[in-house]
Amino acid sequence: MTGSKTALIMAGGTGGHIFPGLAVAEALRARGWRVHWLGAPASMEARIAAQHGFALESVTFSGVRGKGLATLALLPLRLLRAFWQARAVLRRVQPDVLVGLGGYISFPGALMGLLRRKPLVLHEQNAVAGLANRLLAGRADRVFAAFPGAFGSAAPKARWVGNPLRAAFTQQAGPAERFAARTGPLQLLVMGGSLGARALNELVPQALALLPAAQRPQVLHQSGATQIEALRAHYAAAGVQAELRPFIDDVACALAAADVIVCRAGASTVSEIAAVGAAALFVPLPSAVDDHQTRNARWLVDAGGGWLLPQHELSPRGLAQMLSNLERPALLDKALKAHAMQKTSATQELVGACEELAA
């Protein structure tokens, strides 16, 4: 497509919504589309949209599930403000298609778009559809899901396509090729998701300290932007050397370089691990709405592509024992089984739907 159509990407809150949105936004731009991003000001999506050259259209709104009574009491006023702001964005941008990728920020924009008879494409990243997507699914023109059955009865005709991924995740060498040249200590990657994970930041250094120095893996540990100093203190207290970063820009290369990963089970993380083909121990976020991280991880673990450990069962001694027993042949087997579960057509499916609806 070479026409100058306009898309409004609606995704925010966490990397699990934002990075699939980024994959679709970049693919649309490469096809000649003008792309705007609906998000909250001073947010993760605002920062990432700016980094990648997308215009941010601001709407002030926040999630309500799991919040207190005071937040719920203010919901009508906050919704009215968000609807008014979204209406102004739509009048200014005049999008040909709206693309909603979940997160609370997508709801006011999508609803105002439907009232203006704008085509709506929805994608759900998690194994259990979020509230915004469930409410919108019956009115959307196209509905896609990263995991089978994510929408349940809310959208029985939703197409299972996997998660939109940036090209870097599908361009890595396969697991067999990567593992063939590896020798020496295992490479351990620890990721807590885009917001970090305090439990992993505290427990992993303690576990590594229980291993003899000669048996310790080489470690790359992503802390989350606000937890890097605390993470440095944990490793210093444990007497363990590691490469520590608040955020990993090239996640695809980091996944490909790892022999084993300890991580949360956000939708993007699970899909990216499958696309690259890597062995992972998933420790789902216990406070995730609808326990969707456990469901995300279960999809890959049930296929033999990793391990699942609830956070309340995670301990330094147990993790140390697991790490001490790992060998590359078994890790390669897990990586191959994870890789066999990859679904990498989602970006193209969503772009195709946008072009069809805007024609």
Curated annotation (Swiss-Prot):
InterPro entries: GlcNAc_MurG, Glyco_trans_28_C, GlycoTrans_28_N
EC primary class: transferase
Documented EC number(s): 2.4.1.227
Catalysis: reaction(s): di-trans,octa-cis-undecaprenyl diphospho-N-acetyl-alpha-D-muramoyl-L-alanyl-D-glutamyl-meso-2,6-diaminopimeloyl-D-alanyl-D-alanine + UDP-N-acetyl-alpha-D-glucosamine = di-trans,octa-cis-undecaprenyl diphospho-[N-acetyl-alpha-D-glucosaminyl-(1->4)]-N-acetyl-alpha-D-muramoyl-L-alanyl-D-glutamyl-meso-2,6-diaminopimeloyl-D-alanyl-D-alanine + UDP + H(+)
Topology class, membrane: Peripheral membrane protein
Keyword annotations of the record: Cell cycle, Cell division, Cell inner membrane, Cell membrane, Cell shape, Cell wall biogenesis/degradation, Glycosyltransferase, Membrane, Peptidoglycan synthesis, Transferase
One GO CC annotation: plasma membrane
Molecular function terms, GO-annotated: UDP-N-acetyl-D-glucosamine:N-acetylmuramoyl-L-alanyl-D-glutamyl-meso-2,6-diaminopimelyl-D-alanyl-D-alanine-diphosphoundecaprenol 4-beta-N-acetylglucosaminlytransferase activity; undecaprenyldiphospho-muramoylpentapeptide beta-N-acetylglucosaminyltransferase activity
PANTHER family per UniProt: GLYCOSYLTRANSFERASE, UDP-N-ACETYLGLUCOSAMINE--N-ACETYLMURAMYL-(PENTAPEPTIDE) PYROPHOSPHORYL-UNDECAPRENOL N-ACETYLGLUCOSAMINE TRANSFERASE 1
Name of this chain's protein: UDP-N-acetylglucosamine--N-acetylmuramyl-(pentapeptide) pyrophosphoryl-undecaprenol N-acetylglucosamine transferase
Source species of the chain: Verminephrobacter eiseniae (strain EF01-2)
Lineage per the UniProt record: Bacteria, Pseudomonadati, Pseudomonadota, Betaproteobacteria, Burkholderiales
Recorded name of the encoding gene: murG
